[in-house]
Swiss-Prot record:
GO terms for biological process: response to hydroperoxide. It holds the Pfam family H2O2_YaaD. HAMAP family: UPF0246. The lineage of its organism: Bacteria, Pseudomonadati, Pseudomonadota, Betaproteobacteria, Burkholderiales. InterPro entries: YaaA. It comes from Albidiferax ferrireducens (strain ATCC BAA-621 / DSM 15236 / T118). It comes from the Bacteria. This is UPF0246 protein Rfer_2372.
Amino acid sequence: MLFLLSPAKSLDFEKPAAPVPHTQPLFIPQAAELIDILKKKSPRQIASLMSLSDTLAGLNVARYQAWVPKFTAKNAKQAVLAFNGDVYEGLDAKSLPVDDLKWLQDHVCILSGLYGVLRPLDYMQPYRLEMGTKLANPQGKDLYQFWGAQISDYLNIRLHKNAAPVVVNLASQEYFRAVDRKALQARVLECVFQEYRGGQYKIISFYAKRARGLMARFAAEHRLSKPKQLEGFDAEGYAFDAAASEPDRLVFRRQQPLS
């Protein structure tokens, strides 16, 4: 099984990279092509394109200008340790032993507007480029057209040795849309996380994002290899609800968050 995650807007490049293994990103030429486009834009253009404040636009313009195609410990950090949003707080990779990080490296792919796909231990330089950004490029009007079938082709390569390939989608719709489903040669499982509120179960964004990270951590800690094993997920009070689930849509529910 291969697990897909979204990246995070929030980054942590203040703390030094941990003394754990690292790898180089897979799609550096493509990232460099996008950076070249972004480098030509002014802070005002970036603010408009990405709906950012002037401060954030200025920060990211500086990031684009500083970006180079050589990734080192001085300018980059392992992706799973650099991302700092709700998903990654749930995953809490910094507290995992190296063996678990290596398992994540072999079984998790982080989708990225700039880098296409990042393995957890791939070095990345700081950036802001959401997959839904309408950044015109030689391939089309947005990043979905830029990446085309490249991401699904890579996932197929990763899965080709599996007799029954399965992708567990823990990414958002915005990011999973970058995967060409027609080209993807795998069964796709969706995991849905719901909270009990006002007499009914519903998805609450903050908790759902955190739960995606918790599921990835659970998979690493328990070395999950079969879809049935996903049903054992019980972190922070969640439990599998068979009645609410479908074969390719697994629903996990809880009454209230654990304090």
